[in-house]
Amino acid sequence: MTANRLTLSGTVCKAPMRKVSPSGIPHCQFVLEHRSQQVEAGFNRQVWCRMPVIISGKAHQAITQSITVGTQLTVQGFICSHQGRNGLNKMVLHAEQIELIDSGD
């Protein structure tokens, strides 16, 4: 199996951390909070999640500089398990496309 795609929209809820790897690749990490109403088995359901997101590479560096807490985004990429310092695994979205959502203000 090779299918692994996720598209998620939401609001950045934790301040982005920006760093550059020893090989010179820029990385931006943040947490995206998603809230929506979905239909499941014919019933409306309120859904909510927080997804850690990593976006890497110089091609995305300009757009990641404009990301702050409260920024609304749609991201698309693949999911991967990362082991934290506490030894627990967490799901992380590795974004390959990122789009700022105009809030209309």
UniProtKB/Swiss-Prot annotation:
Keywords: DNA replication, DNA-binding, Primosome. Residues 1-102 form the SSB domain. GO terms for molecular function: single-stranded DNA binding. The keyword DNA-binding applies. InterPro entries: NA-bd_OB-fold, Primosome_PriB/ssb, Prisomal_replication_PriB. GO terms for biological process: DNA replication, synthesis of primer. It holds the Pfam family SSB_1. GO terms for cellular component: primosome complex. Involved in the restart of stalled replication forks, which reloads the replicative helicase on sites other than the origin of replication; the PriA-PriB pathway is the major replication restart pathway. During primosome assembly it facilitates complex formation between PriA and DnaT on DNA; stabilizes PriA on DNA. Stimulates the DNA unwinding activity of PriA helicase. Belongs to the PriB family. Homodimer. Interacts with PriA and DnaT. Component of the replication restart primosome. Primosome assembly occurs via a 'hand-off' mechanism. PriA binds to replication forks, subsequently PriB then DnaT bind; DnaT then displaces ssDNA to generate the helicase loading substrate. NCBIfam families: PriB_gamma. This is Replication restart protein PriB. The gene is priB.
